[in-house]
Regions:
Chain B
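A conserved regulatory-domain signal marking ACT and ACT-like small-molecule sensing domains
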Residues: 1-131
C-alpha cells in the first residue's frame, strides 16, 4: 500500500526539482529568521542567491547537537512562539535536553510521513494499533499517534511501560499492529510466552524503532510472534519517527525526500561521499517551519540506495544504521551520552570521575550499570554510609538521564586507564 | 586505639591480597572482622602498627582509613559484655559496630562508637582495662 503515490513514486528528476525549489525557499526563510544561521552564512561569505538548487547544498554549513544546545531552548526557532504549537525534547550531551518545536504545518507534515510509514507496513484504517512508545516530551508516542490518526487506524494509546496493561490490551483489545522499541517487543513476547497467551493475540505487524536493532533481532521477533517486524527511523531534531521507514519488502528505509534531503558524508573530512558509500547520514529539512536545520549531522552511519524499490516507491532508501560516529548510546529508546554520567558524578563531587559504563541486554531489556571507583576521601568504614553514597549517585544519574541505573562501587585504580581518549563504555549487547 | 578499615570488592583473592601486603610489611594482625554487602566488604583490622599498615595498603591503591575504636579487656565470664554495654548506654553512647574474641580467662571487645572520647572516659571511670 502506498499512501501518497504522487510523491512517493515521483521520478528522480521531478523530486530533485521539488527539493531544489524548497531548499531555495528554506534558505531565504532561515537567513532572515534565524540569526545563528545568518551569522554562519555571513562568515562563509554565502548569500541567499548562492543556493540555486540541491547541487549547492554542500555550500551550506553543518548543524550539530551542540549548536542546538548552545541555543537552548528556543534560540534556533525560525518562527515566533505564537506559531509554535508543540515542543518535544530529547537528551542532550551534557544534561541539557535538545529542544525541538513544531508549527501546525509541521505537525501536519509529520502525520503525513508517519501515515506513509504505516501504509508502507500495511497498516490502514482497518487496523487497531497499540502505540507503546512513550507519550510525552519523547517524539515516539505522539509522533506515531498523529500518523495513525491520519490513516484512520484505531489507536490504543498505551504509552511505554506497565507490561501488565500492555499484555491485557494485546489480549483483550486484539490490536493487529503494535509500535514500540524492538527490545521491548521481545520482552512482551517473552511474557506472552510464559503466560501461554501467544495464541490469544491478533498481532500481524510491528512498527519498531527508536533504537538500533539487528537483522537477528528481526528474525527473533518475527519467529516468536509470527508477525512482520518493520523498521521506522527518525530523530527529534529532524522531525521524529517517520523520517524514513521500511516497506513490507524490508530492504532499506524510504526517506521522505520531499521534506528531508539526505547526504552521506565522510565524518572526518566532512566531504560528501559518492552515491552508495557508507558514511555519516546528514539531513537538511526543507519544509520545517519552526526548526529548519541545514545539514544536520545525525552521527548515524548508513548508506543510500537510489534504485527504485520493488514496492514501486522511487524514494531513496537508507540502509540499516550500522553504528555511530560519536559515543551516544541508545538504551531502552533513550539517548544516553557518557558525558551526562560524568557530569552527574562531578556534581556529587565526592567521587573522582573514574567510572565505566556497562550496557547489557538481559531478558531482552537493556540494562545500564555504572562502576565508580571509591575514592579514599569519602570512603567510610560503615556500610550504611557507602550505601547512602550509592543511592545518592544513582539518584543523580537518574535525574539527568531519566532511566534507571545500577551503581556499583569498586576499588580505586581498578578501572582501566587508557592513554588518549578514555574508554568509558562497554556495550555487551552486540547490536 | 586505631583500627584500620579497608574497602574490598567481593572477588576471589582480594582478602588474600591484603594479608600478603601486610605480611610483606611485617605487620601482625591482632583482630579482624569483615562487614559485607552484596558487592563489597569493609575489612576492619587491629594490627601491630596501624600507621605503617595504612601506608603499605595505600601504596597498593587500596582505599583505607584509620578509625578510632576502643578495645577493652574483660574477664571471660558471663555478664562481662552486658556490664560494658550498660556503662555505654547509660552514658548515652551508641555503638556503631563491635567485635570481639575470648580465649582462656580473657576476652577482648572492640567498639566503634559515636563518641570515642566520652566512651573511653566512661569505661575508664568504671575500671575497665584497655588493650
Amino acid at each position: 500500500m502506498i499512501w501518497n503515490e504522487h510523491i512517493e513514486c515521483m521520478d528522480r528528476e521531478q523530486i530533485e526539482k521539488l527539493q531544489s525549489q524548497r531548499l531555495c525557499e528554506m534558505v531565504e526563510r532561515v537567513y532572515y529568521n534565524v540569526p545563528f544561521y545568518r551569522k554562519k552564512m555571513q562568515v562563509l561569505g554565502l548569500e541567499i542567491g548562492d543556493i540555486k538548487g540541491i547541487e549547492d547544498l554542500h555550500k551550506l554549513p553543518f548543524t550539530t547537537k551542540d549548536d542546538l544546545r548552545e541555543n537552548y531552548p528556543f534560540g534556533m526557532f525560525a518562527v515566533p512562539m505564537s506559531q509554535v504549537v508543540r515542543v518535544h525534547a530529547s537528551s542532550g550531551t551534557t544534561g541539557l535536553p535538545t529542544v525541538v518545536g513544531y508549527t501546525r504545518n509541521d505537525l501536519s507534515n509529520w502525520s503525513e510521513i508517519v501515515a506513509r510509514a504505516l501504509y508502507g507496513a500495511g497498516v490502514s484504517k482497518e487496523d487497531r494499533i497499540q502505540n507503546s512508545y512513550g507519550y510525552g516530551l519523547f517524539t515516539g508516542g505522539l509522533g506515531l499517534h498523529g500518523g495513525a490518526e491520519k490513516v484512520g487506524a484505531t489507536i490504543l494509546p498505551l504509552s511505554g511501560g506497565n507490561t501488565r496493561k500492555q499484555i491485557q490490551s494485546l489480549v483483550d483489545f486484539e490490536p493487529t499492529a503494535i509500535s514500540c522499541t524492538p527490545s521491548y517487543l521481545l520482552y512482551l513476547a517473552e511474557t506472552l510466552k510464559e503466560e501461554e497467551l501467544l495464541d490469544k493475540i491478533k498481532l500481524r505487524v510491528a512498527i519498531l524503532g527508536a533504537e538500533p536493532w539487528t537483522e537477528n533481532m528481526r528474525k527473533e521477533i518475527e519467529k516468536q510472534l509470527n508477525i512482520k517486524a518493520i523498521d521506522i527511523y527518525g530523530l527529534s531534531e529532524i522531525m521524529g519517527p517517520g523520517v524514513s521507514f521500511e516497506c513490507i519488502n524490508q530492504c532499506g528505509s524510504h526517506i521522505a525526500e520531499d521534506h528531508f534531503i539526505p547526504e552521506i558524508i565522510d565524518p572526518k573530512t566532512l566531504k560528501p561521499l559518492p552515491r552508495g558509500s557508507e558514511g555519516e547520514l546528514v539531513f537538511t529539512t526543507i519544509t520545517k517551519e519552526a526548526l529548519p536545520l541545514f545539514r544536520y549531522r545525525t552521527k548515524d552511519l548508513s548508506s543510500l540506495i537510489y534504485e527504485t524499490c520493488e514496492c514501486g516507491r522511487t524514494s531513496v532508501r537508507m540502509t540499516k544504521i550500522t553504528g555511530r560516529t560519536d559515543d551516544m548510546l541508545i538504551i531502552r529508546g533513550v539517548n544516553v551520552f557518557p558525558s551526562q554520567i560524568e557530569s552527574a558524578l562531578l556534581e556529587i563531587g565526592e567521587t573522582q570521575p573514574h567510572y565505566m559504563i556497562y550496557v547489557d541486554r538481559v531478558n531482552n531489556l537493556d540494562t545500564l550499570e555504572v562502576w565508580v571507583e571509591v575514592d579514599e576521601k569519602f570512603f567510610s568504614d560503615e556500610i550504611k554510609q557507602l550505601e547512602a553514597l550509592t543511592r545518592k549517585i544513582t539518584k543523580q544519574i537518574v535525574n539527568i538521564i531519566g532511566i534507571s541505573v545500577k551503581v556499583k562501587l569498586v576499588e580505586p585504580k581498578t578501572i582501566l586507564r587508557s592513554e588518549g581518549k578514555a574508554k568509558r563504555v562497554v556495550d555487551r549487547r552486540h547490536i | 586505639m586505631k583500627q584500620i578499615s579497608i574497602f574490598v570488592e567481593n572477588k576471589p583473592g582480594r582478602l588474600n591480597e591484603v594479608t600478603k601486603i601486610l605480611e610483606n610489611c611485617d605487620i601482625n594482625i591482632l583482630a579482624l572482622t569483615v562487614a559485607d554487602s552484596n558487592e563489597y566488604g569493609i575489612l576492619r583490622l587491629l594490627v601491630s602498627n596501624a600507621e605503617s599498615a595504612l601506608d603499605c595498603l595505600k601504596n597498593e591503591n587500596f582505599s583505607v582509613k584509620l578509625v578510632d575504636v576502643i578495645a577493652v579487656n574483660v574477664s571471660n565470664i558471663k555478664g562481662s559484655l552486658h556490664r560494658i554495654l550498660s556503662v555505654l548506654s547509660d552514658g548515652g553512647i551508641s555503638v556503631e559496630y563491635m567485635y570481639g574474641y575470648a580465649e582462656g580467662e580473657i576476652a577482648a571487645l572492640i567498639f566503634k562508637t559515636n563518641d570515642p572520647i566520652l566512651a573511653s572516659k566512661l569505661l575508664e571511670e568504671n575500671n575497665f582495662k584497655f588493650l
